[in-house]
Structure formats: C-alpha cells, structure tokens
C-alpha cells in the first residue's frame, strides 16, 4: 500500500500520508546515500559498504537495531562541515534520486494537493537525506529522524524519538496533536 488517506470530520482535514522509500522513489534513499558516500571515497569503502549492506538486510528482515544504525549512518555527518555535506547531498539528489522519482507518485501527490489535502511523508530515513527529496515533490510536512545540529555542525547523534516502527506512530500522534491546535 503506497499511502494512507485519512479524513477527520472533527477537524475537516483530509490527510494523505506517504512513505518515501520504494513508494515515492524506486529504491531506498538511506541505502543509496551510504553507497554514494562509499563511491565518492567519503567513507572507508570496506567497512562502510559491508556495514551498510548488513543494516539494510536487517531492515528488510525486520531485525534492525535503529539506534545502532543511526550511530552508524549519522557518523559521517559529524566528520565534515555542513557546507560540504550540503554540496554532496545536492550531488546525491541530482545523480541518484531524481532518476528514480516515480511519475505515478507525482501524479497521486498532485491529485491530493489539488483536492486541498494535507500531505505528509513519514520515513525511517533521516531528515538530512529525505528533506530535499520530499521538497522535490512539493510536500512540506515530513516526519523523519532528525540529526542533531549544534554550533553549525552535525554531531553524529539524533534528536528525539527515531522515526522507526513504533516511533513513527508516536511522532504521527504528536504531529496530529500539534496540527489540531
């Protein structure tokens, strides 16, 4: 199921909720970001590539330790200044993400947008990777794990609840409560 459509007459709001990976795009953006880092020599090829594949398999099998994975996947952000990271991210989006954006997803999003529905993406992939992808679809609302950013740098840690499994439900509940105010 590509998305969830909710209508709540108490608030007169129609909400279309989308996943990102293998729904709006034809692959997994988190895994592709890791491969991008390996291919550009930004991270140690042998260690990072092997670990990235293992975490992706764990994810597909439903056995992923999200905290362990976030420590792994966010660590490269702490090793480089933000401006360099943004340049790499732009290159990543142009070279690996734009070619796999799904036309059917764009059409569905456009239909919901034209109907006046509120659009929301909920993803287990971190906000650093996903925010520009979601913006390409014209969606302003995103629930994703937020990498910690202090003193102009990413720390390699995350803020709040990871947006994964039950965490997605908790973050959605909080978002709905905030949106109703």
Where are the language model's segments positioned?
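N-terminal amphipathic/basic-hydrophobic helices that include classical n-h-c signal peptides
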Residues: 1-12
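Residue-level detector of short coil/turn "hinge" positions at structural boundaries
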Residues: 44-45, 66, 119, 141
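Active-site neighborhood of HAD-like aspartate-dependent phosphohydrolases
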Residues: 11-61
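Metal-dependent phosphoesterase signature
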Residues: 68-104
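C-terminal cap/substrate-recognition subdomain and adjoining C-terminal extension
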Residues: 87, 94-120, 124-181
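Conserved active-site and cofactor/substrate-binding residues in soluble primary-metabolism enzymes
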Residues: 28, 80, 167
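Short, compositionally biased "basic patch" segments
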Residues: 56-82, 141-147
């Amino acid at each position: 199921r590509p998305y969830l459509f909710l209508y709540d007459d108490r608030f007169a709001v129609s909400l279309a909720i989308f996943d990102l990976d293998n729904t709006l795009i034809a692959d997994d953006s988190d895994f592709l970001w890791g491969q991008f880092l390996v291919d550009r020599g930004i991270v140690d090829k042998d260690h990072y590539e092997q670990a990235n594949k293992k975490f992706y398999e764990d994810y597909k099998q439903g056995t992923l330790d999200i905290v362990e994975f976030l420590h792994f996947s966010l660590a490269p952000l702490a090793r480089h200044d933000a401006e360099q990271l943004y340049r790499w991210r732009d290159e990543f989006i142009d070279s690996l993400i734009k070619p796999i954006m799904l036309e059917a997803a764009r059409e569905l999003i456009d239909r919901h947008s034209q109907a006046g529905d509120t659009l929301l993406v909920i993803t287990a992939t971190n906000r650093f990777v996903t925010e520009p992808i979601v913006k390409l679809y014209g969606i302003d609302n995103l629930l994703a794990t937020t990498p910690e950013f202090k003193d102009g740098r990413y720390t390699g840690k995350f803020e709040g609840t990871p947006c994964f499994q039950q965490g997605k439900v908790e973050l959605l509940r909080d978002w709905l409560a905030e949106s109703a105010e």
